[in-house]
């Protein structure tokens, strides 16, 4: 699998700008809308916080990160905890949930447009992240990819439960 974009930070940088713009516009164009959708949006936003924070804790504990180094500087593949559910909890699942949550809370076309564009870029960037992990961890990561979904946490939870039932 080839990288979609050669510059490693291009997609995430553009997606970041779109997400910041989406959030800023949501404050200005927050429409009265369906309260149920707003509640679902807030649930998405709080859930994104879980997927955003757990990798920091998990990588520090299980990733072989040297003291004083960034939690991203892992030396071993982590496939437990949140990483047994999704492969990209921060740059994938959390990002998508933030975009979705803001869309549902704001309920405005500008929020939906910016959010969808950011979601597409973040998802495509997860393919680049997979490629980087294959280069770093090799066949072990490719086998991990077969067990754990990229960003779909519902499918990840179902697969995890099924694996545990078989064990």
Model-derived segments and spans:
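Histidine-centered phosphotransfer motif of kinases
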Residues: 85-93
